[in-house]
């Protein structure tokens, strides 16, 4: 899917659907974190207004998804609870920081590429969830199909913004491929828990 170098373990979807309360609560937290991250990036680099506007649009869409997932939790009588530490995202950011060129544009481009990779993994997982839910006749399958398309669009937005910030498409694509290999190794270490990423 997109730039990913590893596929999710085939057992994950069944585990996620079997413990859907946990998966759905984790999904809500992921949407809020995605919105927060997009806004954080938009406000840290105000010198690039088009980038800030695009990231604000992403944040608004992620916040809408958060509201939708919260409504699903409420309808199913599931408590959101506190978020668990997102070790997947933390490890990915740590690995990127070790190899970043540390210039303002390089740092922003890397943060955007990390966002793109997280969107790509979400995209893959939502496709798997949509298929698994459809196989069980669950009415939420179309919801996850729609999210699959949204996450794919966010992935493209993040990559395009990284290219715009950096101004060097071949270098950005090479960096994305490098970071995608790291993401694949990190994702593989987390096994098959009923969470969206790790």
Question: Model features per residue range: what roles?
Answer:
Residues 1-198:
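Non-heme di-metal
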């Amino acid at each position: 899917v997109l730039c990913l170098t590893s596929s999710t373990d085939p057992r994950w979807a069944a585990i996620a659907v079997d413990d859907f309360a946990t998966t759905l609560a984790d999904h809500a937290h992921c949407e809020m974190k995605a919105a927060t991250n997009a806004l954080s990036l938009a406000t840290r680099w105000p010198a690039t207004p088009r980038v800030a506007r695009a990231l604000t649009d992403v944040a608004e869409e992620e916040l809408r998804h958060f509201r939708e997932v919260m409504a699903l939790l409420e309808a199913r009588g599931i408590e959101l609870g506190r978020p668990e530490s997102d070790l997947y995202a933390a490890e990915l950011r740590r690995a990127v920081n070790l190899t970043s060129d540390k210039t303002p544009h390089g740092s922003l481009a890397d943060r955007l590429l990390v966002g793109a990779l997280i969107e790509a993994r979400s995209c893959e997982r939502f496709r798997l969830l949509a298929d698994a839910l459809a196989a069980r006749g669950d009415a939420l399958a179309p919801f996850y199909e729609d999210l699959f398309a949204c996450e794919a669009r966010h992935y493209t937005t993040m990559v395009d913004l990284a290219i715009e910030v950096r101004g060097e498409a071949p270098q950005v694509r090479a960096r994305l491929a490098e970071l995608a290999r790291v993401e694949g190794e990190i994702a593989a270490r987390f096994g098959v828990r009923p969470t969206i990423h790790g």
